[in-house]
């Protein structure tokens, strides 16, 4: 073959001549001519034999793929598909910047790193003439690729475009693999080349179809911005299936004529062909399988997951949750009712764990009270639709509820609050909206308590009421502060309740004068520790005797125990100053309005 005898003037310069850049051809001739002849001297006899054998195999493959079409025709047919080269993608390694601009088969720059042709780059890695050897072999394979695509072009002009663009996508996925072969010996690299020739099933079946489908709407000029990095391995893979079969697959894909979005950027930096294959199959073409990939993503969470959130988030944003459920409710009433039952059960368990009042465990009789009240007071509102009456029941609850998130609604007078909130909540106005009424349950049971209407900002005033003894008997708690009987919450509750429970105006100043120790002695106890009535008999019996007997000894031991010996948490002790009898305490409680007889 003439290519074997004249390498510098052989196929290495034909693409440059056909593209029409004479400057790059002349520069290549001038730079390569001096060193390419002497580049054989650095090769051993085995390497030369390997190169000649590679050329013969390439020539035989060219004749097989040609099948009657000459090289000139194939070049003229395929060069319009890749008309413009990319000067930006790859830098010139040896300082020849003008060579890159004119040549279409860009991969000649990357050829020294190719695993298919290692002998030249290994022995002559630093010489500029070393690029000629693998470059020519590379061009032979590139020509083979072009001939196969022109054969398919005669059958199906639209499908051959996809076959040309197919190797380009594959080149990038394998561009990093050849750089590992710089350190391998030539024989091992040749064995690797032989091992890479048979393509996997995924490349043989799905890849040409997907690429032919992906490149159908593109014009020939749009293929130019794709960086051609390494076509040697891809040309080996695309050489295996028959061109007729590939063109038939491409024509089948082209006959569908689906509009496909443009291909994703081809920067699949996979090390081996298998992982690059998987990356292109899984993430590269979303248009191939649109339905299973995109369908599960916008799936919403089921309503019970949203409902089983913490108590603080429930209080902070009850309005959003109610509107969310009233949106989901009109479509399917039965899941709404089941989710409400699950919500009640979850709230009941959470309240038991937190030690909060358990009168919230029976929300339905509690909630029916304000709704009955509204039915009595707002008789004129019953006529439009019966579904609006349950819609107003949760509307009255936020206006009276003590939730911190409801502070702006509570700052308004009650009548505009009742007007504003139904405007938001009664808009569904259907019967399933009535099923979402028990959602603002934590605010409903407090509708009758006068303290919480006045003091919405303290979060612990939930548990306060006008009759503290009755209220605090109804729950068990692990700590004092969690159950809402902390000193600060007690003070704020007393200050808030003073205008209602007293007839004189000196009650507020009296509260300010009281020291915290007196308040600590007189405030109601949680149910787990018992109320004051439980300890009255003990006070008269054992503790009174201890006070009379102990005297100063007991006081000194008390001072020691406060500093050194911590009191066990399960024991509750009422500490009163010496000489203060129970009558004084009762009088103080009566003045405070806490003790009613």
Curated annotation (Swiss-Prot):
It is found in: Cytoplasm. Residues 96-109, 342-352 have a biased composition (Basic and acidic residues). It comes from the Eukaryota. Residues 20-39, 328-339 have a biased composition (Low complexity). Residues 68-81, 141-157, 307-321, 492-506 have a biased composition (Polar residues). The modification Phosphoserine is found at residues 130, 132, 515. Putative androgen-specific receptor. PANTHER family: SPECIFICALLY ANDROGEN-REGULATED GENE PROTEIN. This is Specifically androgen-regulated gene protein. It comes from Bos taurus (Bovine).
